[in-house]
A protein has these predicted regions:
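Extended catalytic core of nucleotide-activated donor transferases of GT-like folds
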Residues: 66, 137-140
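Rossmann-like AdoMet/SAM-dependent catalytic core
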Residues: 167-198
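Conserved beta-strand signature within the Rossmann-like core of class I S-adenosyl-L-methionine
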Residues: 149-161
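A short SAM/SAH-binding and catalytic strip from SAM-dependent methyltransferases
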Residues: 124-137
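Short, conserved loop/helix-junction motifs that constitute active-site signature segments
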Residues: 144-148
Length: 198
């Protein structure tokens, strides 16, 4: 097990976001809260979804904040990101928390064979939070989620947010949870949080 002080030191020393303790996600290490740009607890607070015993996929998980927020509820969860630095941070916190139901992997989502996702599943719900702006294959991922998952927690991002919502609506009933991303400390509020269910 990794001790709290060692985990805190590691996470802080690997933060590449100026002005934040631990980069993109606010993370909890024991009773210590390390401030990040986005607060997963606030981000998921209004989501009316029962994560109990669910199998969760987080595409573009960054430092895993969303999965750590629900680690005590889920059967298992898989986080994927292209950045090995953030995945290493996930694994340090995973070891500290003894969160054996969470796993984190490095993959470039734009070059990954989507069939490889089936190796990690099956999944009840997929998270695709603020990713569409950065993914060339965002439509392919939405279609995969629509075929393979019963639900999707999705945050729009970029100039084509209406198009993202329209594609989700081809697969799911789309409910707007928050019409602005108020948890963002950088005050980038123009994203919508959606719960998509069948």
């Amino acid at each position: 097990m990794i001790k709290s002080n060692d985990a805190i030191t590691y996470l802080k020393s690997h933060s590449h976001k100026k002005g934040y303790d631990t980069g993109y996600h606010t993370l909890k290490v024991g009773t210590t809260v390390l401030k990040g740009q986005r607060n997963p607890e606030e981000r998921i607070f209004d989501v009316d979804y029962d994560f109990t015993k669910k199998r969760v996929l987080d595409l573009g998980c960054n430092r895993g904040g969303m999965l750590f927020e629900i680690q005590d509820k889920v059967e298992y969860a898989v986080g994927i990101d292209h950045d090995s630095n953030v995945i290493n941070c996930c694994n340090v916190l995973r070891c500290h928390n003894k969160a054996n139901n969470l796993n984190f992997y490095v993959h470039d989502l734009d070059t990954m064979n989507l069939q490889d996702l089936n190796l990690y599943g099956p999944f009840d719900i997929a998270f695709m939070l603020s990713m569409s702006r950065w993914l060339k294959k965002w439509k392919t991922y939405i279609n995969w989620i629509g075929t393979n998952c019963k639900a999707c927690l999705f945050e729009t991002n970029g100039s084509n947010q209406d198009e993202q919502i329209e594609l989700l609506a081809e697969h799911f009933n789309v409910k707007i949870i928050n019409d602005h991303s108020f948890d963002d400390a950088n005050k980038v509020y123009d994203r919508k949080l959606l719960l998509c269910t069948k």
